[in-house]
Design a protein with these regions (language model features):
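Structured alpha-helical
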Residues: 1-103
Length: 103
């Protein structure tokens, strides 16, 4: 069984992929400090890099991930690894995940 380096938190939240022509939404789950699982109608392929915004519950501002890479894909589900995220955004994510851990 694979052991992960970073704990994943199982909950669902809305995500948004801003685009030049059209923006696409989806649902994120299994969130960690380095990535998440996504379900969306947005077509992707392994290795594709994209920007996204995550609507974290209880927070007014979306969490912006400047660049994430698709690491696996199966149908409308795929795994993203966060490659570029601002230091303030990363700290917001860490604080949010620590509140989930505290229960």
């Amino acid at each position: 069984m694979e052991q992960r380096k970073h704990r994943r938190y199982r909950f669902h939240c809305e995500i948004w992929f801003p685009g030049k022509q059209v923006s696409v939404t989806g649902t994120a789950s299994d969130l960690s400090v380095i990535g998440c699982k996504v379900e969306s109608k947005k077509r992707v392929y392994i290795g594709k890099c994209l920007a996204l915004q995550i609507c974290l519950p209880g927070q007014e501002a979306t969490l912006k991930v400047d660049q994430a890479a698709v690491r696996w894909a199966k149908g409308q589900e795929y795994g993203l690894e966060f490659l570029t995220i601002g230091s303030e955004e990363e700290e917001r994510l860490r604080r949010f995940l620590s509140t989930l851990e505290a229960g």
